[in-house]
């Protein structure tokens, strides 16, 4: 079920919130778990069994660690093998079989497994929980219902943010529900819906135009790269806003997942602002345990390559995703060794550098093959004897320039800063009075787009 779908907005969500707020305080986690299971089972009920098995083994491993502390390492290893084994079987089996066939020349049939929605996200949450219990950073959760509610919580279940157990554990036991929190959560949810429906979906129309175009030009390829990069940002940050907003309505405080990454002055900073929950997960559970940067140069380079190769592989079972991760690893390596010092001396050029590198990275991210990525990157550089533009390109530029401009400005802190400045002035009270009306109007416009449009799944649902 999609957050940006009519059944969710007008059937599931009102019923879920009604059940949640009518439930007594001691049963709210049970009500949340029930709603989350219904939400997850809506499309593919059988996948609930995969998630239930993953939750049960994580729960058992953590409880056994406290009971048998001398066997903590063995229990952690078994739990990690089970969690990653389930993820690997569902997500990477066909990738490995294809690679085996390519190397050996055999024709082992593919399993063609349907990927359970959100498995990459809830697997990482289970892993972080078990590791935190192993390290002594958190006690094992005694209530299976509370642990399952944390892992299966429908606001963040299928596309994050990846919520740490240590961050949310106190809120599972005791949280407050206020009208102000509900209002702020609803505001965040509607704004996220607007990002998805009015920006991400419209930007993807331009991506589709490029993909279906028989005559490509240099300018059209640059427009495609910009549209796709902004589409991914507004699609995923929009979902994160909706998840954070829903959590706030129910008394949870989730950490931010995006902080205006396109204003970064380096790619190192970019990844501190983009998909923050994933980056911090790999930092704390992979990079630092490998030794981080406090090792000799050769080992540090290897650590960086491993982490970014895994980051790419987490996004998808294809070599293009692995190369996408290694692409960033190379840039981060150069920034650490010498490029960072140069960028600090060139404040204007460093932003051009970040945006250009990011544009080419998203061409690789979207490509179905390495040859397709090379072809698109070559077109952006004017290779292949393509025209710079043609009549069709100018038509699409005229048609999509407003949404590209709106998305470009909207991806910066400028709109939020402008709203804060207005709110601090004489017009602040007027703005406060008009905000609920504006949000209702935005919801109505989004609903109209959804009624007239087709299915629009969130990009990160497939991860």
What annotation goes with each model-predicted range?
Residues 1-462:
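Membrane-embedded transmembrane alpha-helical bundles that form the catalytic cores
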């Amino acid at each position: 079920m999609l957050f940006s779908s009519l059944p969710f907005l007008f059937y599931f969500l009102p019923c879920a919130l009604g059940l949640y707020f009518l439930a007594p305080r001691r049963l709210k986690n049970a009500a949340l778990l029930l709603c989350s299971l219904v939400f997850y089972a809506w499309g593919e009920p059988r996948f609930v069994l995969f998630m239930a098995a993953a939750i049960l083994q994580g729960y058992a491993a953590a409880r056994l660690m406290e009971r048998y502390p001398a066997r903590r390492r063995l229990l952690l290893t078994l739990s990690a093998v089970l969690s990653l084994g389930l993820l690997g079987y569902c997500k990477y089996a066909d990738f490995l079989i294809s690679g085996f066939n390519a190397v050996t020349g055999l024709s082992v049939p593919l399993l063609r497994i349907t990927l359970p929605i959100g498995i990459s996200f809830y697997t990482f949450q289970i892993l972080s929980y078990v590791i935190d219990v192993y390290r002594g950073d958190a006690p094992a959760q005694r209530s299976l219902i509370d642990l399952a509610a944390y892992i299966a919580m429908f606001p963040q279940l299928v596309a994050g943010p990846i919520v740490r157990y240590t961050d949310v554990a106190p809120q599972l036991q005791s949280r407050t529900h206020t009208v102000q929190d509900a209002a702020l959560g609803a505001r965040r949810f509607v704004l996220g819906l607007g990002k998805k429906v009015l920006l991400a979906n419209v930007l993807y129309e331009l991506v589709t135009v490029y993909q279906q175009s028989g005559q490509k030009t240099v300018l059209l390829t640059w427009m495609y790269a910009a549209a796709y990069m902004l589409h991914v940002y507004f699609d995923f940050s929009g979902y994160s806003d909706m998840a954070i907003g829903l959590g706030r309505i129910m008394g949870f405080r989730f950490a931010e997942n995006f902080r205006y990454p396109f204003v970064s002055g380096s790619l190192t900073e970019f990844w501190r602002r983009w998909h923050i929950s994933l980056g911090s997960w790999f930092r704390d559970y992979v990079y630092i345990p490998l030794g981080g940067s406090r090792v000799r140069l050769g080992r540090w380079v290897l650590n960086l390559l491993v982490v970014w190769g895994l980051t790419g592989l987490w996004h998808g079972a294809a070599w293009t995703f692995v190369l996408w991760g290694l692409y960033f690893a190379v840039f981060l390596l150069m920034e650490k060794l010498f490029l960072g010092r140069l960028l600090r001396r060139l404040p204007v050029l460093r932003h051009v550098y970040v945006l250009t590198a990011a544009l080419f990275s998203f061409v690789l991210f979207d490509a179905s093959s390495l040859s397709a990525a090379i072809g698109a990157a070559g077109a952006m550089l004017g290779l292949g004897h393509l025209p710079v533009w043609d009549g069709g390109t100018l038509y699409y530029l005229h048609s999509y320039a407003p949404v590209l401009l709106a998305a470009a400005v909207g991806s910066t802190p400028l709109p939020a800063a402008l709203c804060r400045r207005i709110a601090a002035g004489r017009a602040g009270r007027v703005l406060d009075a008009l905000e609920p009306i504006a949000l209702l109007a935005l919801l109505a416009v989004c609903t109209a787009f959804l009624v007239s449009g087709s299915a629009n799944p969130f990009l990160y649902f497939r991860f």
